[in-house]
Structure formats: C-alpha cells, structure tokens
Amino acid sequence: MTNEEFLQRYDSGKPNFTKDEIEKMAYEEFGNWVDTAEGRTHRWYQEVETIFEVGDRLFAVNWDRGLTEQQENDFDDAEVYEVERKEKVIFTYIRKDTYGND
C-alpha cells in the first residue's frame, strides 16, 4: 500500500485495513515512525499505541503486545485514527535536602 492509497482509504471513512496492513503500521514498517506509547499493563498483555506519519499527517494504531512467550500480539480490536501533536507539561516532585548544605 502506498501513502496515497492509505490516505484515500482513510479519508473514505471506510478504510477496512487488513490485519497484515495494521501489523505493518504497528511494527513501524509503514509510514514514518514517530513514537510508541505504552499504556496499561494487564496480566497477559500491554496496551500499545504506535504513532506514524503519512505525508504531513499523523496517525495512530492501538494494539495489544503479548507479555509472555505464550501470548501473541493481538490486532483483533486494533483501530487506526488520525492524531495531532499537543504539548504537555508535567511537573514532578523530588525530595528536598533538609539537612543543610555542609
């Protein structure tokens, strides 16, 4: 599938991507990989979101990564959707030294 074919299918509203096509998106074999976000961890799998770029647009595919050698990666409920980059500021707190600065 070319970038143009992907965009045409996505913009049609009914892309019907195959499992193989979704796997390629998830495994960074289609488009330009941007980021991978690891989500909630369950007993046997972890939720994963792979972000990739096609042309000047950003897309994501969510899928489940198997956490043991007996668990396969799962794409049955995978979804492909367009995303946008947003800045997010996060504050963390560290312990303050309370024993003087000798």
Per-segment meaning from a language model:
Residues M1, R9, W33, Q71, ...:
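Intrinsically disordered, low-complexity peptide-like regions
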Residues T2, T18, V61, R85-E87, ...:
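Generic cytosolic/nucleocytoplasmic N-terminal low-complexity/intrinsically disordered segments
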Residues T2-A37:
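Negatively charged, low-complexity tracts enriched in Asp/Glu with abundant Ser/Thr
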Residues L7, N16, E72-N73, Y93:
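Short linear motifs centered on Gly/Pro in flexible linkers and helix caps
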Residues S12, R43, T68, K88-F91, ...:
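Sequence-pattern detector for short linear motifs
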Residues V34-A78:
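Acidic, low-complexity, intrinsically disordered interaction modules
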Residues N73-D102:
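Mixed-charge, Lys/Arg-enriched low-complexity segments
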